[in-house]
């Protein structure tokens, strides 16, 4: 592009040069007959009045001769021209200016920005600066990913937030600030589940495709990393059984029974006896009744496919599915998923902060966060497309701290590429690029490419050092070489040369001062700037870092019952035996017989 522009400029200047050539030819024409001496003398006099042009019989001939000479000169110039790029022979990389970059990308309203470094912000309105708001943050343990990026951006209080919060540090420090700014704070706490808001994935199943996605994502999220089944039959058959159960609950069960604990109840009701192929389990009876009502029910189709094997095969399939869902046998997880309090679509309509707390030393329950992410993207995209004309009224910012700890959909790179127009953005936070390569072996470069901002906070992983060094590029520098020869006619020489050098070599990237960060914005020079100082944020006084008490979620805020005991017990008080109460569960047939229906 640069060479094309230079060529176009040269042609324009050459064409403009015709005018002075013709002018000079007309001044010279009256003196051509007197020879070179007369031409020199006449031109000297003509310069006294340069626009007093006299047309004579030699004017046309002189103009043609001058134009021919000019054309030959231009032809020689273009034919012998060299493509020089002075001071860029080995590379044109150089450092950008943080203040200039900030002036170009920041929003005038300080609260309507994402904080990248101490002196660089980027506004939320991507239509102004034509960059997406997806940010890739890379920094080793202790580099300040949470303190210098996650918390300052959440403290901006300018979007809805979905924060993956290992250990619960972020919600503890800034939850009070968010509530004081009018946010609804919701917490999916997989560390202390008794303090968590409830999350029921069944609530967000709009159609059959959503059911299929839920089951597929559940199986993917519960598959250990690096494991490959040599026989996928069992997983496929188990997924068919799970689809049958989920479809049955979605279309036939009341809303309060549409949850994973009820899936486990149905699974336990499907007892299979290997020595008795004629045995009909309660689950079989349930689907037999469904067949009488609706023979083409989608749940029945999947159940027939599952039930086409022998009793031994069916037993193995049930065991496979039970192993996938075994976490839902825990009372804590069953209670958490029995109902729903998260109201996921509301994140795109009003300011809500949703925190997903996961243990940093145990990944047993992280599959639930994976399902949450998938359903959040589906709900927000659907809301933007079908209710708000393509873009959410409230921007939603996903802050994915410890990104590598949660399984994400295989097409996450495609989701990343289409979320900008919907008013959704993601901050991917990693310890190093090796984590991203392990998660998305083939798509990791596409994910990096869909993040217009890359923030490097420092680390100690070699491949990341090399990647950052190559991203910085090479610059052209001056070098000196010295020579000295000894002897009777010895001499000393100095040679000056130019050479190429990386802006920062991999070892210099490794030695990056812990106070600094490297910032890359698509189409801009790289910037080295201070990491953001959280203590300089205007809202820090409302957080635990600013001296406020830590935010505690899931605690009762008011008494729901009160017992008052009178200290003066009457002397004539007598004890009364409590009336015993018993319960009996009756089937539909028993009820019909009792009430004579």
PLM regions and their residue ranges:
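Basic- and hydrophobic-enriched, low-structure N-terminal and domain-boundary segments
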Residues: 1-143, 147-150, 194, 485, ...
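Extended hydrophobic/Leu-rich segments
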Residues: 36-43, 105, 485-489, 505, ...
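Short alpha-helical interface patches
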Residues: 49, 60-113, 208-218, 262-269, ...
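A broad, low-specificity signal for short, low-complexity segments enriched in glycine/proline
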Residues: 94-102, 117-127, 147-148, 313-319, ...
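Short gly/ser/thr-rich secondary-structure transition/capping motifs
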Residues: 115-124, 338, 382, 438
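P-loop NTPase motor domains
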Residues: 131-424, 439, 443, 507-528, ...
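Conserved ATP-driven motor cores of ASCE-family P-loop NTPases powering translocation/secretion/packaging/pilus
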Residues: 416-418, 422-518
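Short, surface-exposed polybasic-aromatic patches that bind anionic ligands, especially phosphate groups
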Residues: 533
């Amino acid at each position: 592009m640069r060479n094309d522009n230079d060529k176009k400029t040269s042609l324009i200047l050459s064409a403009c040069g015709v005018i002075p050539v013709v002018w000079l030819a007309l001044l010279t024409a009256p003196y051509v007959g007197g020879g070179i001496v007369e031409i020199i003398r006449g031109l000297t006099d003509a310069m006294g009045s340069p626009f007093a042009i006299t047309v004579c019989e030699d004017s046309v001939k002189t103009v043609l001769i001058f134009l021919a000479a000019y054309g030959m000169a231009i032809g020689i110039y273009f034919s012998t021209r060299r493509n020089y790029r002075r001071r860029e022979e080995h590379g044109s990389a150089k450092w950008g200016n943080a203040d200039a970059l900030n002036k170009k990308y920041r929003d005038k309203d300080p609260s309507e920005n994402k904080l990248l470094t101490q002196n660089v912000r980027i506004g939320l309105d991507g239509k102004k600066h034509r960059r997406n708001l997806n940010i890739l943050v890379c920094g080793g343990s202790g580099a300040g990913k949470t303190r210098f990026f996650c918390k300052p951006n959440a403290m901006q209080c300018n979007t809805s937030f979905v924060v993956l919060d290992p250990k619960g540090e972020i919600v503890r420090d800034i939850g009070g600030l968010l509530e004081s700014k009018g946010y609804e704070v919701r917490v999916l706490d997989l560390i202390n589940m008794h303090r968590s808001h409830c999350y029921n994935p069944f609530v967000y199943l709009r159609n059959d495709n959503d059911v299929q996605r839920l089951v597929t994502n559940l199986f993917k999220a519960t598959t250990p990393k690096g494991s490959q089944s040599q026989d996928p039959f069992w997983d496929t058959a188990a997924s068919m059984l799970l689809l049958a159960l989920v479809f049955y609950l979605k279309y036939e069960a009341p809303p309060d029974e549409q949850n994973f604990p009820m899936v486990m109840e149905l699974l336990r009701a499907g007892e299979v006896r290997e020595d008795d192929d004629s045995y009909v389990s309660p689950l079989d009876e349930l689907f037999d009744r469904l067949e009488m009502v609706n023979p083409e029910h989608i749940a029945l189709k999947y159940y027939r496919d599952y039930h086409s094997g022998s009793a031994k095969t069916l037993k193995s399939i049930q065991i496979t599915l039970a192993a996938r869902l075994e976490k839902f046998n825990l009372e804590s997880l069953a209670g958490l998923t029995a109902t729903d309090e998260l109201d996921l679509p509301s994140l795109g309509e009003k300011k809500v902060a949703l925190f997903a707390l996961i243990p940093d030393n145990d990944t047993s329950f992280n599959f639930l966060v994976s399902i949450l992410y998938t359903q959040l993207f589906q709900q927000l995209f659907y809301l933007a497309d079908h209710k708000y004309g393509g873009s959410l009224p409230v921007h939603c910012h996903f802050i994915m701290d410890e990104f590598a700890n949660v399984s994400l959909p295989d097409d996450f790179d495609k989701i990343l590429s289409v979320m900008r127009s919907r008013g959704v953005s993601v901050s991917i936070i990693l310890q190093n690029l090796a984590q991203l390569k392990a998660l998305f072996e083939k798509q990791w470069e596409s994910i990096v490419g869909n993040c217009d901002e890359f923030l490097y906070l420092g680390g100690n992983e070699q491949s990341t050092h090399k990647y950052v060094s190559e991203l910085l590029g090479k610059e052209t520098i001056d070098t000196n070489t010295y020579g000295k020869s000894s002897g009777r006619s010895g001499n000393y020489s100095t040679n000056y040369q130019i050479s190429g050098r990386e802006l920062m070599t991999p070892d210099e990237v490794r030695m990056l001062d812990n106070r600094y960060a490297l910032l890359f914005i698509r189409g801009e020079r790289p910037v080295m700037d201070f990491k953001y100082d959280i203590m300089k944020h205007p809202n820090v006084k409302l957080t635990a870092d600013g001296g406020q008490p830590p935010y505690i979620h899931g605690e009762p805020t008011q008494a729901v019952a009160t017992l008052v005991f009178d200290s003066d017990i009457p002397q004539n008080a007598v004890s009364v035996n409590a009336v015993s109460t018993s319960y009996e569960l009756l089937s539909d047939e028993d009820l019909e017989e009792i009430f004579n229906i």
